[in-house]
């Protein structure tokens, strides 16, 4: 089992954890429907950047 050589100080512990924070997801608003979706992803209505790119069950 691994055993640490020296105790890590609170400052070094904080520096080690400095990149662990979670970021909020990048959300975009579809201009045609006003729906919120993840950036670079198709909205639930099948629109991407103002154009219909996928047929949905509601369209059929």
From Swiss-Prot:
Residues 1-36 are annotated as: Disordered. One of its GO terms (molecular function) is structural constituent of ribosome. Transmembrane segments: none annotated. It comes from the Bacteria. GO terms for biological process: translation. Keywords: Ribonucleoprotein, Ribosomal protein. One of its GO terms (cellular component) is large ribosomal subunit. PANTHER family: 50S RIBOSOMAL PROTEIN L32, LARGE RIBOSOMAL SUBUNIT PROTEIN BL32. Belongs to the bacterial ribosomal protein bL32 family. NCBIfam families: rpmF_bact. This is Large ribosomal subunit protein bL32.
């Amino acid at each position: 089992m691994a055993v640490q050589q020296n105790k890590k100080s609170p400052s070094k512990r904080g520096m080690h954890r400095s990149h662990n924070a979670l970021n909020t997801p990048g959300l975009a608003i579809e201009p045609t429907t006003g729906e919120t979706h993840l950036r670079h992803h198709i909205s639930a209505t099948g629109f991407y950047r103002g154009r219909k790119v996928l047929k949905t069950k509601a369209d059929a």
